[in-house]
Structures are given as structure tokens and as C-alpha cells.
Amino acid sequence: MHILKDSLSITVSSGDGGAGCVSFLRERFNTKGGPDGGDGGRGGDVIFKVKANLKSLSLYKNGQRLAANNGKPGMGSRKSGASGEDLVIFVPPNTCIYDVATGSMLFELQNFDDEVIALKGGRGGLGNVHFKSSTKRTPRFAQPGESGATLNLRLELSLIADIGLVGFPNAGKSSLISTITASKSRVANYPFTTRFPHLGVLKASYNDLVIADVPGLIEGASQGIGLGFEFLRHISKTKILVFLIDVASDNFMSAYDILVNELSAYDIGLSSKKRIIVANKLDLEGAIENFNQLKRALVGERVLGISIYDNTGINELVSELFALSRI
């Protein structure tokens, strides 16, 4: 499949080191003891880690600022401050991390066990116990903690969609992907609203599925008519196809045949992929009758009816997509 890109920019900061402590030993029988100030704790690191079941960057928002915790200051009795908690940023496999300032790629995380420290936390300052000498028996100073660092980063994810939405222009693909995911595709009542692949993520507690709404298919796409080659290349490596058919239109029966024929003409493997036939616009006049006719004609196919207008069948469709992804 032509690789689709998802990207966002974030600002990350590692934690400051805690300050060293100025303290002197004070005991019942030793009121003028020596220095015993402990060291400050280390600031938290910024760590990027691949999480196996993530399929998108949707855990984060574009422009979000994220920071590790600062180290705690040192204490008396030579006690060191606690280290700051690391900031762990979970990303999907195939995520590249770029420095916004230079445009250079800093890290590439490809595999499920990949992990990288992007920024080290600041070192904790030394307590005054370290500065005692023969000439300075009561040092009344300690080191401040080292400051953490900040980076403006761009995360870029190479995506191969799990599900491809297949349908004629205005079949309702953009509206469907907006309904079943958090995505908002541009919707208008004319052909080729979707000029470029548009991605959404179906989220569940155990898995995410990436769904691609790509430019509408028309007859002759396999010969390059319309956005043909571009469209077919985008869906060639998806695991599941959703054939979206407008059953309120006059040509609903021929739409299925054209979709199958165009996919087969481009790549014989496309027409044999796991698929669901989804009859859309059941809320419109005559659509229910056409839907029943379509089901009778397509014995052996998974055929579901939906209405994006009133959400009829949407939950059933989402459940079926997750079920198919596990087969």
C-alpha cells in the first residue's frame, strides 16, 4: 500500500535536578556537628517507547506540552532527594521523531520493543557535605540542581490502514468515517470530496483499527480514470474492505458489480479480501426495499444496512469490523 502519514508536533521537557541541601549535624551532645546536607534527586528523563497495540498518535494532541517531573531537593542527615518520575511517551511501531528546529530525524522506532531516551533529566545538586575541607569546615552552600532540557519535536507515523472504505463518490464514506471514529472528514454534496486519503481510528480497549477513507472509485478506475490508480494503490494492502453502497440511488445493484470488477481488474487479490457490504442511507425513501433486494442478490456476502443520519446499524458495523480483524 502507498504509505499514509500521520504527524503531530509536541514539546517535551526533562525534569530539573533537585537542589543540594545545606544542613549541619545537630545532636543532643553534638550541637556543632559537621555538614550533612544530602544531594538533590535526578530530574526525570523523557523516554519514547513502542506500545504494540497502538495504531495511531491519537493519545496526544498537536501542540501539546509534556514534561517529566523534577527531582526533589536533598535533606539533612545526608539523605538524597527522590528522583523525578520519567515521562514515558508511548508510540506505535514505525514512528519517526524529528527535531522541529533543524528538521533532522533524531530517532526511528520500528519494533515492538524499541525504546529511546530522548532527553536526560538534570543532575541533582550536591549537598554541602561534599564541600567540607580543611579550610571550610562549615560550608554554608550547596549546588543547585541542573536544569532539564526542552525539545520541540514532530512525530511522524507511517500507517498501513487495516480497513479500506470502497465506494462511489458521495456513497457516504466521509460521513461514515466521521461517525464511527473521532475523525472529521470534509463533507460536501459533490463527487470527489475526499481528494487525499483520510484516516480515522476505531478504538477499543484491546485494539485499535486504522480505517482509510480514500478518493471515491468510479468505473474505469483500473485504467486510471478519475483518481483510479491512486485510489487502488491506497487500498491494496488493507486487511478488510468495506463496500459502501448508496441504496437510495437508482444504480445500487450495478454499483456492487462495478466495484468488484474494478478491484479485480487492478489486482485479482483485492476482490478476494475479507469484506463487508454496507448498504447506506436506509432512512431515505425506497432504501429499505432496495436493501432487501441487495441482500437477496448477494447470498453468501456479509451485508449490513446502516443510516448515518439516525445511526441505524452503526454499532453492529463496528462490532463486525473488530470481529473480522481477529479472524
Curated annotation (Swiss-Prot):
Binding site for GTP: 167-174, 192-196, 213-216, 280-283, 307-309
Coiled-coil residue windows: none
Gene Ontology molecular function, alphabetical: GTP binding; GTPase activity; magnesium ion binding
InterPro entries: G_OBG (IPR031167), GTP-bd (IPR006073), GTP-bd_Obg/CgtA (IPR014100), GTP1-OBG_CS (IPR006074), GTP1_OBG_dom (IPR006169), GTP1_OBG_dom_sf (IPR036726), OBG_GTPase (IPR045086), P-loop_NTPase (IPR027417)
Limits of the OBG-type G domain: 161-326
Signal peptide, first to last residue: none
Annotated positions binding Mg(2+): 174, 194
EC numbers, comma separated: 3.6.5.-
Function: An essential GTPase which binds GTP, GDP and possibly (p)ppGpp with moderate affinity, with high nucleotide exchange rates and a fairly low GTP hydrolysis rate. Plays a role in control of the cell cycle, stress response, ribosome biogenesis and in those bacteria that undergo differentiation, in morphogenesis control.
Sequence similarity: Belongs to the TRAFAC class OBG-HflX-like GTPase superfamily. OBG GTPase family.
Gene Ontology, cellular component aspect: cytoplasm
Name of the protein this chain belongs to: GTPase Obg
One Pfam match: GTP1_OBG
Subunit architecture: Monomer.
Ranges where the Obg domain occurs: 2-160
Gene3D superfamilies: GTP1/OBG domain (2.70.210.12), P-loop containing nucleotide triphosphate hydrolases (3.40.50.300)
GO biological process: ribosome biogenesis
Necessary cofactors: Mg(2+)
UniProt keyword annotations, A-Z: Cytoplasm, GTP-binding, Hydrolase, Magnesium, Metal-binding, Nucleotide-binding
Cell compartment(s), UniProt: Cytoplasm
